[in-house]
């Protein structure tokens, strides 16, 4: 709940049972607050860990294995407690390196007591896990450097549901509603957070404001959104539109409206190990990518032929790249087609899910053999 607003159907309820595509989901109470301020944010993290641990113990049906995902790191801790209490093998899924990424975005300095405490939790989870699933090769390398056994590490990169994300015409109802006409639309879709370097995109929009054939679209929520909106209004960046968060089922229309998708992170050595999962959805929609994330993500986009790289936080290079796409629209169309073909071959979510399931079967078999 990045805005601190809990949907009415969940308010003042300790536990809500739901079903999602045949899977039972237990939604537990959380202290929801706007994603601003370390103390309140930490309280939100801790409240979920405690409620998930409690209700997980009482209501989750018998299982063969317990999987927990991080971040945030206390989710992993909740899974570990439940697995230990039930004497079941524990699998940790690492989608971001906490608390290292907290330091990387400048939220807390290295050596801060909170960071040291999280590092203790992190090390314990790595020791306790029967298997650790990471989403990039670089994450695996970093954890091996920190003493985690390579034998328990498995790289499972994100993929895409190719049946859900299907290329569509750019003449959408959203384009009409926003009065975009045939203008070229460069979009950022996703979390508006400290890590995402969106001031750079606004700097680019401001620089290119004279181009009436170009608009910038921001879709999403996050800790930085209100500040970014205030900046747009104060500096009169009239070619930038911040839509806020839209329902997940409108994602295809958003991508279809877009001529170029922007994927950005701040300049940090840590982020060279990150692969933003949105690049797979964008490619599946046959939209070109302008990527400002170096490292593994860059290697994927360049190998696909579905996009271009500009250095993180480089306003001049990003502006030039965007103008190049505006002036030669056929280039972006061709890149989008190559990107779709590439993810269809390499990042089909069904195939990746089968590999993940093989890992879980191996964990369960090993646990039973030593029981």
Residue positions per predicted region:
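Carbohydrate-associated surface elements
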Residues: 138, 159
